[in-house]
């Protein structure tokens, strides 16, 4: 086991494209860190730099107290699990798991003990004589994890390992990976574009965008207090409703006061349909219902803002508002009719205010 520390890590490709823009990160011994962000944000590049599969332009990567910038991947004491499993098709499950240990010259009794222990942990003991083509996608991913486990590394690296699995199997494997990591107490860094995967797996959540870190924190802290509008819109499904208060002179009233320019945010579950005004300092929005999604235990209501409520147009065209869509999440299956006009309210402590450029969170 080991901690992993990144100090001002940068990656610039020939031609000047800066893929990683000065990342600082510390993953404690035994912690599960998830790098999450959209495609092209640099999360896989950063993971490959930790693994030694990508060179570092500047900065330091420290694993277990040792700077590994110039250390070969095989000597970093890490094990990596890939999206495509990377199994040898002509080898049995046993030999796939034992292959790396044999190459390192490990004694046969030790190899046998490690493979059998990993097979027991992953419940694949009955499959050791099978070839990869005889396995399901979930079973292949277990074998790939077993191959990593037998190395007994200081750090596990996961590069979108569940992307090739169907939705049901993804959920099952996600739970297995978390249980496995807790059981082994091995430091892990995991890359995904799936924010639900990230929220459920992480001790430390690192939200990335355009080669840089937007926010680091526990999943619940990141969800409850997003540092930027990017984080607010990326973490959460449906995403946070974001209302630009500077568009066409639009402002919001809180307790009789009018805000300055910025971006107002509110989570769909923090809006309630009500004809009664909220407590002092809360927010009221008038909406026209445009779509309904019933998904069983909850319903999503999509509405377009209409004049009224606590959003005031104080531009040269009083009474007009940009046609921004608002999403409401309500429990159960009862919902207003499409075309109906409704009022929704939010309590002040559930509101978020960001700077006009979206880069800074402001207290409401």
Swiss-Prot record:
EC number of this enzyme: 7.6.2.10
GO BP annotations listed: carbohydrate transport; glycerophosphodiester transmembrane transport
One Gene Ontology CC term in the entry: ATP-binding cassette (ABC) transporter complex, substrate-binding subunit-containing
Topological relation to the membrane, as annotated: Peripheral membrane protein
Catalytic activity annotation: sn-glycerol 3-phosphate(out) + ATP + H2O = sn-glycerol 3-phosphate(in) + ADP + phosphate + H(+)
Main location: membrane
Cellular localisation: Cell inner membrane
Keywords: ATP-binding, Cell inner membrane, Cell membrane, Membrane, Nucleotide-binding, Sugar transport, Translocase, Transport
Domain ABC transporter: 4-235
Residues that, per the record, bind ATP: 37-44
Coiled-coil segments on the chain, per record: none
GO molecular function: ABC-type glycerol-3-phosphate transporter activity; ATP binding; ATP hydrolysis activity
Keyword Metal-binding: no
CDD domains: ABC_MalK_N (cd03301)
Family from the record: Belongs to the ABC transporter superfamily. sn-glycerol-3-phosphate importer (TC 3.A.1.1.3) family.
Stored PANTHER family: MALTODEXTRIN IMPORT ATP-BINDING PROTEIN MSMX, SN-GLYCEROL-3-PHOSPHATE IMPORT ATP-BINDING PROTEIN UGPC
Known role: Part of the ABC transporter complex UgpBAEC involved in sn-glycerol-3-phosphate (G3P) import. Responsible for energy coupling to the transport system.
Classification via NCBIfam families: PRK11650.1 (NF008653)
Subunit structure: The complex is composed of two ATP-binding proteins (UgpC), two transmembrane proteins (UgpA and UgpE) and a solute-binding protein (UgpB).
The protein's name in its UniProt record: sn-glycerol-3-phosphate import ATP-binding protein UgpC
Organism (species): Rhodopseudomonas palustris (strain BisB5)
């Amino acid at each position: 086991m080991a901690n992993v520390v990144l100090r001002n890590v940068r990656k610039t490709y020939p031609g000047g494209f800066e893929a990683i823009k000065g990342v600082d990160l510390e993953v404690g011994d035994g912690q599960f860190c998830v790098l999450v962000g959209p495609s092209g944000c640099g999360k896989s590049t950063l993971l490959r730099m930790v693994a030694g599969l990508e060179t570092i332009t500047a900065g330091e990567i420290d694993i277990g107290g040792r700077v590994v910038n110039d250390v070969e991947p095989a000597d970093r004491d890490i094990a990596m699990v890939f999206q495509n499993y990377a199994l040898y098709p002509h080898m049995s499950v046993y030999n796939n798991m034992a292959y790396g240990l044999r190459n390192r010259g490990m004694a046969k009794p030790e190899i046998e003990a490690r493979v059998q222990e990993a097979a027991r942990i992953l419940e694949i003991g009955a499959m050791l004589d099978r070839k990869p083509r005889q396995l399901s996608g979930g079973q292949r991913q277990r074998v790939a994890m077993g191959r990593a486990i037998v190395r007994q590394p200081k750090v596990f690296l996961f590069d979108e390992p569940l992307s090739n699995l169907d939705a049901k199997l993804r959920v099952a494997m996600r739970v297995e990976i978390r249980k496995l990591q807790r059981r082994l107490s091995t430091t892990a860094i995991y890359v995904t574009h799936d924010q639900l995967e990230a929220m459920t797996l992480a001790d430390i959540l690192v939200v990335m965008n355009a080669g840089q870190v937007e926010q680091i924190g526990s999943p619940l802290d990141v969800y409850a207090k997003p540092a930027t509008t990017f984080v607010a819109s990326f973490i959460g499904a449906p995403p946070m409703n974001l209302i630009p208060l500077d568009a066409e002179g639009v402002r919001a009233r809180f307790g009789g006061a009018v805000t300055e320019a910025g971006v107002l945010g509110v989570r769909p579950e923090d809006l309630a349909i009500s004809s009664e005004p909220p407590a002092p300092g809360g927010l009221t929005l008038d909406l026209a219902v445009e779509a309904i999604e019933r998904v069983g235990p909850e319903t999503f209501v999509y509405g377009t803002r209409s004049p009224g409520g606590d959003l005031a147009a104080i531009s040269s065209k009083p009474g007009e508002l940009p046609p921004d869509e608002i999403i409401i999440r309500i429990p159960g299956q009862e919902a207003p009719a499409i075309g109906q006009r409704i009022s929704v309210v939010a309590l002040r402590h559930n509101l978020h205010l960001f700077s006009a450029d979206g880069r800074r969170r402001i207290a409401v």
